[in-house]
């Protein structure tokens, strides 16, 4: 589960339009906007290096931040988009949405797999095929999980892992209302070839 909410520093951006945004970039900032929460949008500047470091850590769009802006009350936000330079792939603008801890939000949560060494199907040479490396969940803003965990213990060749097989955090609900596939364990190619030959002989 998500732990302590990290702080994110920003400054109020004076001026509007492309000119102010370009000036911010020249001074080492990434222009951004904070919206929602029943308040007027707030134009901000985010330190470029801070944003880049956060992006490199991963799960930036799945992280709830405590936004600290001088002269403003601290507010919980979540990133709703990062625009990037089409050539350099570096951030040029960032959007944040204000949230309450009890707000509900849809997020893609990463799926991890554990106990590979306890899966007989993998020991026999089977291959774990991941169909959905991320799952979109509706979650409470104050309880965003870091990831979902799939336990591979006792999994055999031919096993199919569905979303209903995963223990979801309390209050988390998949946005897709069906028991969709997360992953499966397929037979090694040699075993599949042998099975096909046997079927051909029987035919």
Curated annotation (Swiss-Prot):
Which keywords, in A-to-Z order, does the entry hold?
Ribonucleoprotein, Ribosomal protein, RNA-binding, rRNA-binding
Q: Does the keyword Heme apply?
A: no
> Can you provide one Gene Ontology molecular function annotated for this UniProt record?
structural constituent of ribosome
**GO BP field:** translation
Any coiled-coil regions, as ranges? none
What domain of life does the native source organism fall in?
Bacteria
Which PANTHER family does the record cross-reference, listed alphabetically? RIBOSOMAL PROTEIN L25/GLN-TRNA SYNTHETASE, ANTI-CODON-BINDING DOMAIN-CONTAINING PROTEIN, RIBOSOMAL PROTEIN L25_GLN-TRNA SYNTHETASE, ANTI-CODON-BINDING DOMAIN-CONTAINING PROTEIN
Described function: This is one of the proteins that binds to the 5S RNA in the ribosome where it forms part of the central protuberance.
This chain belongs to the protein called Large ribosomal subunit protein bL25
């Amino acid at each position: 589960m998500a732990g302590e909410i990290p702080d994110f520093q920003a400054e109020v951006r004076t001026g509007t339009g492309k000119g102010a945004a370009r000036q911010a970039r020249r001074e080492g900032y990434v222009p951004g906007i904070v919206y929602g929460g029943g308040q007027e949008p707030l134009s901000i500047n985010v330190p470029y290096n801070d944003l880049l470091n956060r992006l490199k850590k991963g799960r930036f769009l799945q992280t709830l931040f405590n936004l600290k802006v001088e002269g403003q009350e601290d507010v919980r936000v979540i990133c709703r988009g990062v625009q990037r330079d089409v050539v350099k792939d570096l951030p040029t603008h960032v959007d944040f949405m204000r949230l309450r801890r009890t707000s509900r939000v849809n997020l893609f949560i990463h799926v991890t797999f554990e106990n590979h060494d306890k899966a007989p199907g993998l020991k026999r040479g089977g291959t774990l095929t991941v169909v959905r490396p991320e799952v979109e969940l509706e979650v409470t803003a104050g309880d965003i999980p870091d990831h979902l965990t799939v336990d591979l213990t006792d999994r055999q060749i031919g096993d199919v892992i569905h979303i209903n097989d995963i223990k979801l955090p309390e209050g988390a609900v998949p946005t897709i209302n069906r028991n969709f596939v997360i992953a499966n364990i397929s037979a090694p190619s040699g075993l599949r070839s042998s099975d096909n030959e046997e079927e051909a002989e029987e035919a």
